[in-house]
């Protein structure tokens, strides 16, 4: 039998409205704590990530127990494809605050196969080190109430939950990037690298 992998995030070529419906349906089917991908409306600073996920409010109560376990970064550079960097974080806000530096260090060490890839990696690392608004998604574990509350945050575009029997460590995870409007497809890569 073929090997199958759980996925979180849109498929290449998928219509964005179809993915948004699929993500909403996944949260509606959750009946206990679940792992979920949170994709943002725009690239956020880590401070905005913490605000959008750590003190989630529902009518009449504060929801605790939302745990960010991975922060995903992609530095926006017009008409330049930049790499997606995913940084695992322990369960505390300070680790989330330090995660752009970890992503920057990884980018510099990875470099690239071509001069352009190396230039993109260095430009991305520089912006991450400077605290850019570059977080495009997070992987969280939360209760159904927590996931529903996160869905209503103004910075959140989509929340997609994994099935309860799936492992986030074995799943392919790719956020819905802010620039995906109609269809999930790569943009141009012909712009100058700063």
Question: Which residues does each PLM region occupy?
Answer:
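Inhibitory N-terminal propeptides of secreted protease zymogens
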Residues: 1-153, 157-194
């Amino acid at each position: 039998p073929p090997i199958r992998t759980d996925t979180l995030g849109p498929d290449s070529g998928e219509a964005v409205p179809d993915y948004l419906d699929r993500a909403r349906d996944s949260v509606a089917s959750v009946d206990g704590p679940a792992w979920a991908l949170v994709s943002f409306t725009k690239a956020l600073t880590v401070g905005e990530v913490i605000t959008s996920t750590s003190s989630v409010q529902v009518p009449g109560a504060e929801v605790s127990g939302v745990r960010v376990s991975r922060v995903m970064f992609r530095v926006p550079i017009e008409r330049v494809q930049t790499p997606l960097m995913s940084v695992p974080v322990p369960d505390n806000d300070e680790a989330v605050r330090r995660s752009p530096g970890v992503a920057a260090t990884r980018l510099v060490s990875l470099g690239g196969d071509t001069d352009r890839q190396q230039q993109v990696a260095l430009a991305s690392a520089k912006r991450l080190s400077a605290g850019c608004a570059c977080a495009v998604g997070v992987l969280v574990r939360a209760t159904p109430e927590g996931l529903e509350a996160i869905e209503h945050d103004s910075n959140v575009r989509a929340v997609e939950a994994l099935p309860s029997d799936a492992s986030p460590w074995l799943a392919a995870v790719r956020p819905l990037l802010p620039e995906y409007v109609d269809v999930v497809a790569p943009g141009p890569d012909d712009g100058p690298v700063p």
